[in-house]
Amino acid sequence: MKSGRRGGQNWAPSRQAPASAESDVALRHVRRAEELFRRKAKEPLTLAEAAACAGCSVRALQLAFRRCRGMTPMAALRRMRLEAARAGLADGPTSIRAIAAAYRFTNPGRFARLFKEVFGQSPSELRQAQDRTTG
Protein backbone atom coordinates (compact mmCIF):
# COMPACT_ATOMS: atom_id res chain seq x y z
CA MET A 1 0.00 0.00 0.00
CA LYS A 2 1.36 3.42 -0.99
CA SER A 3 1.17 6.09 1.63
CA GLY A 4 1.44 9.20 -0.53
CA ARG A 5 4.53 10.23 1.40
CA ARG A 6 8.08 9.57 0.46
CA GLY A 7 10.85 10.23 2.93
CA GLY A 8 8.47 12.03 5.28
CA GLN A 9 7.38 14.56 2.66
CA ASN A 10 4.38 14.73 0.41
CA TRP A 11 5.62 13.75 -3.05
CA ALA A 12 2.58 15.06 -4.93
CA PRO A 13 3.33 18.18 -6.95
CA SER A 14 2.37 21.39 -5.22
CA ARG A 15 -0.70 23.17 -6.54
CA GLN A 16 0.26 26.45 -4.90
CA ALA A 17 2.14 29.09 -6.82
CA PRO A 18 5.25 30.55 -5.24
CA ALA A 19 4.51 33.40 -2.84
CA SER A 20 6.17 36.02 -5.06
CA ALA A 21 4.09 34.98 -8.07
CA GLU A 22 0.93 35.14 -5.94
CA SER A 23 1.91 38.61 -4.75
CA ASP A 24 2.51 39.78 -8.32
CA VAL A 25 -0.90 38.52 -9.41
CA ALA A 26 -2.59 40.04 -6.35
CA LEU A 27 -0.92 43.41 -6.96
CA ARG A 28 -1.97 43.32 -10.62
CA HIS A 29 -5.59 42.72 -9.58
CA VAL A 30 -5.42 45.55 -7.04
CA ARG A 31 -3.94 48.01 -9.53
CA ARG A 32 -6.59 47.21 -12.14
CA ALA A 33 -9.35 47.76 -9.59
CA GLU A 34 -7.75 50.99 -8.36
CA GLU A 35 -7.60 52.31 -11.91
CA LEU A 36 -11.33 51.60 -12.24
CA PHE A 37 -11.93 53.38 -8.92
CA ARG A 38 -10.07 56.46 -10.17
CA ARG A 39 -11.89 56.52 -13.51
CA LYS A 40 -15.33 56.04 -12.01
CA ALA A 41 -15.04 57.65 -8.57
CA LYS A 42 -18.25 59.61 -9.14
CA GLU A 43 -20.22 56.62 -10.44
CA PRO A 44 -21.88 53.76 -8.59
CA LEU A 45 -19.55 50.75 -8.42
CA THR A 46 -19.99 47.27 -7.06
CA LEU A 47 -17.44 44.81 -5.84
CA ALA A 48 -18.48 42.45 -8.64
CA GLU A 49 -17.74 45.16 -11.24
CA ALA A 50 -14.33 45.81 -9.71
CA ALA A 51 -13.52 42.09 -9.70
CA ALA A 52 -14.60 41.72 -13.33
CA CYS A 53 -12.41 44.66 -14.32
CA ALA A 54 -9.49 43.19 -12.36
CA GLY A 55 -9.97 39.81 -14.03
CA CYS A 56 -10.58 37.80 -10.89
CA SER A 57 -13.31 36.62 -8.55
CA VAL A 58 -14.78 38.83 -5.85
CA ARG A 59 -13.07 36.74 -3.17
CA ALA A 60 -9.71 36.89 -4.95
CA LEU A 61 -10.00 40.68 -5.14
CA GLN A 62 -10.87 40.90 -1.44
CA LEU A 63 -7.85 38.78 -0.54
CA ALA A 64 -5.59 40.75 -2.89
CA PHE A 65 -6.59 44.07 -1.33
CA ARG A 66 -6.18 42.67 2.16
CA ARG A 67 -2.69 41.42 1.28
CA CYS A 68 -1.50 44.44 -0.72
CA ARG A 69 -3.33 47.37 0.89
CA GLY A 70 -4.43 46.11 4.29
CA MET A 71 -8.07 46.98 3.59
CA THR A 72 -11.06 45.79 1.62
CA PRO A 73 -11.64 46.93 -1.97
CA MET A 74 -14.65 49.00 -0.94
CA ALA A 75 -12.66 50.67 1.85
CA ALA A 76 -10.02 51.55 -0.75
CA LEU A 77 -12.72 52.99 -3.03
CA ARG A 78 -14.15 55.00 -0.15
CA ARG A 79 -10.65 56.31 0.68
CA MET A 80 -10.08 57.35 -2.95
CA ARG A 81 -13.42 59.11 -3.01
CA LEU A 82 -12.59 60.93 0.23
CA GLU A 83 -9.25 62.05 -1.21
CA ALA A 84 -10.96 63.29 -4.38
CA ALA A 85 -13.55 65.13 -2.28
CA ARG A 86 -10.77 66.73 -0.26
CA ALA A 87 -9.15 67.96 -3.47
CA GLY A 88 -12.54 69.27 -4.60
CA LEU A 89 -12.94 71.19 -1.35
CA ALA A 90 -9.58 72.86 -1.98
CA ASP A 91 -10.44 73.77 -5.58
CA GLY A 92 -13.20 76.24 -5.04
CA PRO A 93 -16.48 77.42 -3.61
CA THR A 94 -18.60 74.34 -4.37
CA SER A 95 -20.60 73.41 -1.29
CA ILE A 96 -19.42 70.60 0.95
CA ARG A 97 -22.75 68.84 0.47
CA ALA A 98 -22.45 69.02 -3.35
CA ILE A 99 -18.90 67.68 -3.30
CA ALA A 100 -19.89 64.87 -0.95
CA ALA A 101 -22.83 63.94 -3.17
CA ALA A 102 -20.67 64.05 -6.31
CA TYR A 103 -18.45 61.36 -4.77
CA ARG A 104 -21.39 59.14 -3.76
CA PHE A 105 -21.62 60.17 -0.10
CA THR A 106 -25.37 60.61 0.26
CA ASN A 107 -25.37 61.21 4.02
CA PRO A 108 -23.56 64.49 4.83
CA GLY A 109 -23.07 63.54 8.49
CA ARG A 110 -21.47 60.23 7.60
CA PHE A 111 -19.29 61.97 5.02
CA ALA A 112 -18.10 64.48 7.64
CA ARG A 113 -17.38 61.69 10.15
CA LEU A 114 -15.42 59.58 7.64
CA PHE A 115 -13.57 62.66 6.40
CA LYS A 116 -12.51 63.56 9.93
CA GLU A 117 -11.44 59.98 10.69
CA VAL A 118 -9.17 59.94 7.64
CA PHE A 119 -7.84 63.51 7.55
CA GLY A 120 -8.06 64.61 11.19
CA GLN A 121 -10.39 67.52 10.48
CA SER A 122 -13.91 67.91 9.23
CA PRO A 123 -14.66 69.26 5.75
CA SER A 124 -15.81 72.56 7.27
CA GLU A 125 -12.62 72.80 9.37
CA LEU A 126 -10.59 72.26 6.20
CA ARG A 127 -12.53 75.02 4.47
CA GLN A 128 -12.05 77.39 7.41
CA ALA A 129 -8.31 76.70 7.48
CA GLN A 130 -8.10 77.37 3.74
CA ASP A 131 -10.03 80.62 4.14
CA ARG A 132 -7.57 81.79 6.81
CA THR A 133 -4.55 81.05 4.61
CA THR A 134 -5.97 82.50 1.39
CA GLY A 135 -8.05 85.35 2.79
Role assignments for model-derived ranges:
Residues 2-35, 39, 53, 67-72, ...:
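Short, Lys/Arg-enriched, Trp-marked, Pro/Gly-tolerant hinge/linker segments that flank
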Residues 7-8, 17, 61, 83, ...:
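Small/flexible residues
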Residues 11-14, 47-76, 100-122:
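Basic/polar phosphate-binding segments, predominantly the helix-turn-helix DNA-binding elements
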Residues 31, 35, 39, 44-49, ...:
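Terminal helix-turn-helix DNA-binding modules in bacterial transcription factors
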Residues 125:
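Short beta-strand "wing" residues that participate in macromolecule-binding interfaces
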